[in-house]
C-alpha cells in the first residue's frame, strides 16, 4: 500500500503525527464515551464496589501476566496485527459488560479487558515513535507526544461529555434493554470501536510479511523478552521510571474507580440525573486538554526538563486527589477532578518522553510493555486493596490512601534526573550486541 501524501503523509513529521493523532484520538473517544458512567452502569446491574474492584484486579493481573510476552511479540511480528487483536478483545469485553447480569459475565469482561490492555500497550505508540525517528531530520519527541496528548484529551473531553450526558438525554425514550439506563453509553462506544479497527487497518502501514516469515519472527519472541528485561535493569533511568509507572497505576485506577461514587454522595446515581456526570466528564476532559496544551507549548522550557515536570505533576496530582476526597461538594469534586486530570496529562507526556528517549527502536514495544506492566501492577494494587477499603469503609478514604502513595513515589523522578542517560544508551548497545 503506497504511503498517502499530503495531510497524512508518512514522509513528514506533520503527516505522521496527524495520522497517529486521528487514530489515537478516535480510540480515546471510544474509551471515554462509557467511562463517566462505567462504574454507575456496573452498580446499576447489581455489582457492589468490592466486586467491581475485584474485576479490575483480575484485569490487572491478566495484564501483568501477558504484558511482557505480548510486547515482545509486537516487536517480533509487527505492531498492526497485535493492535488489531487488542482492539477486538476490548470490543468483546464491552459487549459482554453491556449484557452483564451476574458475576460470570463481569469476570469475562475483566478477562477480555486484560487481554486487550496487555496487547494494546506500546504497539501503536512504538509504531508512531519509530516512524518519527525514521524521518530524515531531527524532531522534538516531547512536543510531538504532547500534540498526540492534545488530540487524545480533546477526544476524551468530547467522549466524556457526550457519554456522561447520553443516559439523561435519552432517559425518556424508553430504549430497550440493554441500551436502557447507562447501557446506551456503552453501545455508542462499541460502534466507534468498530470504526477504529477499520482505521487501524488503513492507517498503520507496515512491511508485508508472509505467514512463514511471521512464524519465524514469532519464534524470536523469547529472546526479545529476555533482552527487554535486561534493559529494564541496566538502563539507569528505567528502575526509577518503573517505580513512577506503578504509582501512576495506583493513582489512575483510584481516580477512575472512586470519583463517581464520591460524586454520587452529592449528586445521586440515577440515570435521569446523569447530566452532572457529563459536566464532570467535561471538566476532567478539558483539564486534561489544558495539561497537554501546556506541555506542548511550554514543556521543553520547564526548569529541570521532563523529569522535573513529571515529578511536579505527581505532587500536584496527589494534592488534587486529597482535595477531591475531603471536599465532596459540587465545587470540591469539580476542582479536585480538574486539577487531578490536568496533572495526569502533564505527567504522562514527559514520562513517555523519558522512556522513549532511553530505549532502542528494535526493543521499543517490549520496553513500553514493561512500563505498562508495572502500571498495571499499580492498578492491581489499587483495585484490590483500595476497592476493599472503599467497600468496607469509604471511597474517600481509599482515594486518600492512593494520593499519599502517589505523593511518596514522586521522588522517583529525582532518581531519573540524577541517572546518567548517556551511559544508559551505551548499555543499550551492549545488551543488544549480546542478544
Question: Residue ranges of each PLM-predicted region?
Answer:
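Juxtamembrane intracellular "pre-TM" segments in multi-pass secondary transporters
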Residues: 2-14, 204-242, 433-435
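Helix-loop boundary and gating motifs at the non-cytosolic
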Residues: 4-65, 98, 103, 236-284
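C-terminal transmembrane bundle of multi-pass solute transporters/carriers
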Residues: 7-8, 53-57, 64, 68, ...
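Hydrophobic core of transmembrane alpha-helices in multi-pass small-molecule transporters
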Residues: 25, 93, 103-120, 246-247, ...
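Transmembrane alpha-helix termini and helix-breaking/packing motifs in multi-pass membrane transporters
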Residues: 39, 44, 97-99, 156-186, ...
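Cytoplasmic helix-loop-helix junction between adjacent transmembrane helices
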Residues: 111-152
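Helix-loop junctions on the cytosolic side of multi-pass membrane transporters
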Residues: 180-182, 189-216, 415-428
Amino acid at each position: 500500500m503506497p504511503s498517502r501524501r499530503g495531510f497524512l503523509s508518512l514522509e513528514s513529521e506533520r503527516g505522521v503525527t496527524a495520522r497517529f493523532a486521528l487514530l489515537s484520538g478516535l480510540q480515546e473517544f471510544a474509551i471515554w464515551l462509557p467511562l463517566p458512567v462505567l462504574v454507575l452502569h456496573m452498580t446499576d446491574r447489581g455489582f457492589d464496589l468490592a466486586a467491581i474492584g475485584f474485576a479490575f484486579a483480575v484485569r490487572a493481573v491478566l495484564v501483568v501476566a501477558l504484558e511482557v510476552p505480548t510486547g515482545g511479540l509486537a516487536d517480533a511480528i509487527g505492531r498492526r496485527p497485535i493492535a488489531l487483536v487488542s482492539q477486538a478483545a476490548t470490543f468483546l469485553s464491552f459487549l459482554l459488560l453491556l449484557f452483564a447480569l451476574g458475576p460470570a459475565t463481569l469476570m469475562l469482561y475483566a478477562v477480555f479487558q486484560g487481554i486487550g490492555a496487555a496487547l494494546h500497550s506500546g504497539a501503536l505508540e512504538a509504531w508512531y515513535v519509530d516512524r518519527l525517528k525514521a524521518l530524515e531530520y531531527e524532531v522534538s519527541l516531547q512536543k510531538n507526544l504532547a500534540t498526540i496528548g492534545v488530540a487524545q484529551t480533546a477526544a476524551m473531553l468530547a467522549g466524556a461529555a457526550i457519554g456522561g450526558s447520553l443516559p439523561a438525554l435519552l432517559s425518556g425514550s424508553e430504549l430497550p434493554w440493554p441500551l436502557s439506563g447507562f447501557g446506551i453509553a456503552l453501545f455508542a462506544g462499541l460502534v466507534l470501536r468498530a470504526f477504529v479497527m477499520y482505521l487501524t487497518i488503513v492507517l498503520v502501514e507496515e512491511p508485508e510479511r508472509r505467514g512463514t516469515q511471521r512464524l519465524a519472527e514469532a519464534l524470536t519472541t523469547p529472546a526479545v523478552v529476555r533482552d527487554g528485561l535486561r534493559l529494564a535493569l541496566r538502563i539507569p533511568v528505567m528502575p526509577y521510571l518503573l517505580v513512577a509507572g506503578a504509582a501512576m497505576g495506583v493513582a489512575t485506577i483510584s481516580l477512575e474507580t472512586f470519583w463517581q461514587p464520591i460524586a454520587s454522595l452529592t449528586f445521586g446515581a440515577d440515570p435521569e440525573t446523569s447530566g452532572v456526570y457529563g459536566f464532570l466528564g467535561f471538566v476532567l476532559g478539558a483539564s486534561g486538554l489544558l495539561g497537554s496544551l501546556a506541555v506542548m507549548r511550554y514543556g521543553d522550557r520547564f526548569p529541570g526538563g521532563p523529569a522535573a515536570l513529571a515529578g511536579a505533576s505527581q505532587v500536584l496530582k496527589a494534592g488534587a486527589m486529597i482535595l477531591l476526597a475531603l471536599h465532596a461538594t459540587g465545587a470540591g469534586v469539580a476542582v479536585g477532578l480538574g486539577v487531578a486530570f490536568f496533572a495526569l496529562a502533564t505527567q504522562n507526556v514527559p514520562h513517555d518522553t523519558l522512556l522513549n528517549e532511553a530505549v532502542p527502536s528494535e526493543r521499543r514495544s517490549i520496553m513500553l510493555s514493561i512500563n505498562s506492566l508495572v502500571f498495571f501492577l499499580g492498578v492491581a494494587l489499587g483495585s484490590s486493596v483500595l476497592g476493599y477499603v472503599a467497600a468496607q469503609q469509604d471511597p474517600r478514604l481509599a482515594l486518600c490512601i492512593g494520593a499519599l502513595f502517589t505523593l511518596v513515589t514522586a521522588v522517583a523522578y529525582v532518581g531519573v534526573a540524577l541517572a546518567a542517560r548517556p551511559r544508559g544508551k551505551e548499555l543499550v548497545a551492549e545488551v543488544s550486541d549480546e542478544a
